[in-house]
Amino acid sequence: MNTYHSPMSTGASAQSDVRDYEANLPVIPAQDFQLTDYGAVGDGVTDNTEMFRLAIASCAEAGGGRIVIPAGVWLTGPIVMRSRIELHVEAGALVTFSRDFDQYPLIASSFEGWQVVRCQSPIDGDQLEDIAITGEGIWDGGGEAWRPVKRSKMTTSQWNQLVASGGVVEQSGGEEKIWWPTTAALEGGTIANRLHEEQVRDVAAYEKVRDFLRPNMVSLRRCKRVLLDGPTFQNSPAWNLHPWASEHVTIRNVSVRNPWFSQNGDGLDIESCRHVVVENSVFDVGDDAICLKSGKDAEGRELGLPSEYITIRDCTVYHGHGGFVIGSEMSGGVRHVRVSDCTFIGTDIGLRFKSARGRGGVVEDIQIERIYMKDIIMEAISFSFFYANQEGSARGSDLSQEISEETPVFRDIRILDVVCAGADTALLVSGLPEQPLDGVIIQRYNVQARSGIQCAHAKHLHIAELQAQITEGPLVHLHQCKGAELESIQGKGADGRLLMVTGHESAGIVCREGDAETEGRQISVGPEVRSGVIIRR
C-alpha cells in the first residue's frame, strides 16, 4: 500500500498521529491507452469529446490503466472519470474545454457548501476509487466563457474590450457594474436561489438558468484514493479543484492558476474530506487559494462531514484572497489540520479564518508553522466571524446573541514561526461576543506592518516571542478579551504603547514584567476597564 505520512508529529508519542495522517495513493494497473488510438486529433479544432469517452470506456473495461494524452491542443467537452483510471497529460499537451454550454448537462453536485444542481464539471467524478490525473501538461477550463466580471476589477480599455466581445451588462444606479456572458446567466441567480430555497431537486426545473450554473473545473465527489500530480489546472468557470466528501486525496506538484479578477476563482477547496495531503504546489488565483470547508449552515450541520486529518506543506501562493483559509462554509467542522513551510507573496490575507453566525460547526486542533509572507495587502493573520451579510453579522458590536447550534466555535489553534515582511495589519481577531475565539497560541512571530495586533472577543490567547515593527497605533490592542498572556514581546506601538486594553469584560490580561513599561513602552486601559485586569508577573 502506498501511503504518505505527515511530517508534523515527531517523537515516541507521535505514532498514533502518524497513522491518522496517512493518505493512501491510488492503485492503478500499469497499462497504457493512447488517446490518439481512438481517433483524437490535437489540432485545437476537432471536438474530441467522444474520443475521450471511448478511451475511458475501453480502459475501464480492461480493468483500468493510464490514458496518455500526447503533445497537442485537445478540444473536448466534459470528461467523466471512472475508477482505476489515470489521465496522463504529457509535456506539451493542452486540453481545452468547449465553450458550448449545451455539452455540460445539469447534474446533482455541490457548490459553496450546499448540494445543488450545477452544470457538469469539465472533469467530473462521483463515487469512484483509485483515480489520478498526472503529467506535465495543462488543463484549461475555458472559464472566460462562463464567469461574470465586475467593472471595478477592469481598466477602462479592458472593460470596453470585454463588452465589445458580446454578452450583457448589468447596471445599477445608472452605472455599469457586472458583465455577464448571456442574458440567461444575468437573470439566473434569482431564479436558481429561489429553487434552492424551495428545495427543488428536479434537475429539469433548472434548465432555464443553466447559463448561471457554472461548474467547478475538477469536481470529485465521494471518491477514495485520488492523486493529482504534476499538471497545471487553469482558467476554471468557478472553483478550480474541488474534492468533496472524499478520502485519501493527494495533491502534489501542481500549478493552479486563475485570472486575478475571476469571480469565485478559488484554487483548491477541500470540502468534507478526510486524509488529505497537499504539497509542493503553486497557486495564483482570483479568490481563496488553499481552502478547507465542510458544508454551509443547517445543510452542512445535518450532513455532519468534517474536513479532518489534512496536511499542507511546501506550497507557494501568489495572488489570492487568502493564502491558507478555513471557512466560511465550515458547518460540518474542520479539525486535525497541519500546515507547514508555505510562502505567500502578495495575497490579500495570509492565514485566514472566517465564519458567521448561522454557520455552527467546530474548528479545532489546527497547527500552522513556518509560514513566510511578503507584501500582504490586508491582514497577515485574520480571524473574522462576521463574514456573511446577515442579521447580527455586523463587525464591531459587543452585543451577544444566544448560543445555539448555529454558533460557530474556533478553538485550539497554534501558529508558530511566522515571518511577514509587510502587511497592513499583523493580526486581526473579530470574535463573537457570545463565543469568543478560544485557545490561540501565536509564538515566534516576526512581522512588519502598518498596524499591530487588534484583538476583540478572544479568550486564552497566548502571544510569545513577538518581534514587531509597526507604524500606526499601539502594538497590541485587546478588547473584551479574557485570559490573554503576552510574553517576550519586542517592539512598541507607533504611539509608544505596548498594550492597550478596552472593554468592561476584559479580564486576566497577563503581561510579563520584563515586557511592561520598558524602553518607553506604555500600557493603557480604557476608563471602563475594571481595576486589576492587568496582571504583571
Indicate where each model-derived feature is located:
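Extracellular/periplasmic carbohydrate-active domains that bind, remodel
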Residues: 2-537
